[in-house]
Amino acid sequence: MRRGKPAALAAGAAAAGVLLPVLTELRLRRTARPLTDRWRCEAVEPRGRTPLGVSFRPLQAAALGLEPGAALDALLAYPFQLIRLSAYWDQIEPAPGAFAPGELDRQLDAAERAGKQVIMCVGPVKAFGYPEYFVPAHQLDGPLREGALVTPGEHPRLLDAALSQVTRLVERYRGRAAITAWQVEHEAVDPLGMEHSWRLSEAFAAAEVAAVRAADPGRPVLMNGFLATSTPVALQQWWRTRDQGDSLAVAQRLADIVGIDFYPRHALASAGPLTLYLDGSRKRWQQRRRERLLDRAAAAGPGPRGPGAAGRRVLIAEGQAEPWETVTVPPSLAGRAMSSCRPEDVIANYSQCLSWGRAQGLVLDGYLFWGAEYWLARERRGDPSYLRAFARVLECA
C-alpha cells in the first residue's frame, strides 16, 4: 500500500501535466462575432524574398456557390506570385482508360497568362481540398480497410495505378515553365481526418516520389504535413502515426521541400451561440517541433537543393485564412466573422509564420493562404473584408 501511494501520486502528477496544457489551450467563444476594421491596422510582417500566394480548390468554390473558373480568374487578378493547383484523380480518370485533364489544363493556362508560378499537386491518392481522397472507384477492389497501413505489398494494383497516374501527369506538364515544384500526396501518411483511419505507408509514398523524380529530375518535390498547435491534437497525431512518423516527419525524409499546414485555431464543439476552440499555437511547448524543423533547414544553408538535400527548404503550404468551424463549409453570416478566423487573423497568421523564418535566419520558400474561395463568397454576400485583408498583405509586405 505504501508503494502504491507514490505511484498514484506520480500518475496524478503526470495526468495534471497533460491536463494543464490542454486547459490553457481551450477557448470558449461566441461562434460569430461582429465584424470590425481591425484588419486595417494589424501589423504586416515583411515578406522579403518569400513568394506569397493561394491554393485553389474548385470543389470548395462550387460548394460555396461560386463558378470555379470565374473564381480562379478573380483570384489571379491579385498581384501574388505563387498558386497551388491540384490534379484530382477521379475527375481526370472518370472511367477505366479515360484521361480527361481538360479542366486542369485550363487552370494552368490561366495561371500562366497571369504570370504566376505554380506548385502542381499530382496526388494521386490524396490531394488538398475536401474530401482529400480522390481514387477512382474502378481502381480499387473495395474500400480501403479502416485502421490499415496501405503498403505496396498489400496493394500492388493501387500502387501501379498511382505510379502510372503521377508519371502521366508529370510527363504532360513538365514542359510548363510556370511549374516550380511537384507536390506528392497531401499529408501523405496521416489518417484522413476523422472520416477514415487507413494510412499510406512511407514505402508507398516513397515509390510515388521516385516516379515523379524519374519523370522530371529537374524539379523539386514538395510534401506537406499538419503542424499540431495544441496538446490534444499533437498527442492524437503522435499516437495514430507512431509506427512510421507523421507526414511532416516523412516529408523531411523524402521531399526536397517540406510544406507546413498551419491552423492555429479550430472548433471542437458548438452549443447554441458558443463554440469551444483549441488554440495553443503561441504556447511555448507548442513551438518546439516547428523550431526543430526550421532549424534543420536553416542549418543546411543555401547549398544544393536536389533530392540529396531533403528537408533543406520549408514552405507554409496552408496558412489558415478561413474559419475552421464544426462544419465542412465555413459559415458566412452577414456582419459577422467566425471566431476561428476573422479578417485580422488572415494577416496575423501570416505575420506569425513569416516571423518564424526571420527569427531563425531562414527564407521560407513560400506562404500560401488557405481559404481564398471563402473570401470571394464573403465578398459576393457584401463583405469584402477578408479579400481586403489579403490585399493589404500583398500591398504592405
Describe each region flagged by the PLM.
Residues 50-56, 81-85, 118-122, 180-184, ...:
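Hydrophobic faces of well-ordered beta-strands that scaffold small-molecule active sites
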Residues 130, 150-158, 162-198, 365-369:
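Active-site groove signature of glycoside hydrolases
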Residues 97-102, 126-151, 198-199, 236-238, ...:
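Aromatic- and acidic-residue-enriched segments that line the glycan-binding/catalytic groove
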Residues 41-43, 68-141, 194-224, 274-284, ...:
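Aromatic-lined substrate-binding rim segments of carbohydrate-active enzymes
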Residues 119, 123, 311-397:
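Substrate-binding cleft of secreted/luminal carbohydrate-active enzymes
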Residues 202-203, 207-210, 214-225, 229-329:
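Glycoside hydrolase catalytic-domain groove-lining segments
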Residues 61-77, 162-172, 233-251, 343-354:
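Short, acidic/polar
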Residues 3-82, 210-213:
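N-terminal carbohydrate-binding accessory modules
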